[in-house]
């Protein structure tokens, strides 16, 4: 026989905030959170191509469009399409789009690098015999990849904001 107590189970979610507060947890965007000062303060470098445009759009979706930028985000994007699915006649039926972003966040007031690194990921798309559909699928995969990479970088910036938030 188990001594399962439903009341104890139901009160656990109520105790969670107290447990998190006791360990020093502060929401990143909370009133005293370290990332609160990042909204509208990060300016990504101007994009030079479609991938860059999609990447900057995704970064601005996370941190807001820069109104009074204190931090400059420099980045270099590289992508490579690789055939991964093959039919019996050796035609490619599926592609992976591998992407890499080398990035650096600089405090423009002190001109010091405060965070940086490399984000890598991939997306896939199926090849089709219709040219328009194939191009649309490839463009969609590229856009999804830029959003994924921007999310990875945003998470790293949020984690690092404890060290440099104003």
Model-derived features: positions:
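Acidic, proline/glycine-rich low-complexity intrinsically disordered segments
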Residues: 2, 44-46, 51, 61, ...
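N-terminal export signals
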Residues: 8-25
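Bacterial Sec signal peptide processing site at the extreme N-terminus
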Residues: 20-39
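Flexible, low-complexity charged segments
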Residues: 24-28, 50, 164-165
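Post-signal peptide N-terminal segment of mature Sec-exported envelope proteins
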Residues: 33-55
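Surface-exposed short loop/turn segments
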Residues: 66-116, 124-140, 151
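C-terminal/domain-edge helix-coil "capping" segments
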Residues: 136-166
């Amino acid at each position: 026989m188990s001594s399962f107590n439903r009341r104890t189970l139901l009160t656990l979610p109520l105790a969670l905030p107290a447990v998190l507060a006791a360990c020093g947890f502060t929401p990143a965007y909370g009133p005293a959170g370290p990332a609160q000062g990042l909204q509208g303060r990060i300016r990504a470098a101007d994009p030079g191509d479609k991938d860059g445009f999609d990447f900057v759009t995704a970064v601005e979706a996370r941190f807001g469009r820069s109104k009074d930028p204190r931090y400059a985000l420099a980045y270099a994007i590289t992508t490579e399409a690789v055939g991964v699915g093959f039919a019996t006649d050796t035609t490619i039926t599926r592609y992976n789009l591998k992407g890499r972003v080398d990035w650096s966040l600089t405090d423009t007031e002190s001109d010091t690098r405060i965070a940086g690194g490399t984000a890598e990921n991939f997306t896939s798309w199926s090849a089709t015999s219709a040219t328009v559909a194939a191009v649309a699928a490839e463009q969609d995969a590229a856009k999804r990849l830029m959003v994924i990479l921007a999310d990875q970088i945003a998470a790293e910036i949020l984690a690092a904001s404890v060290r440099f938030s104003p």
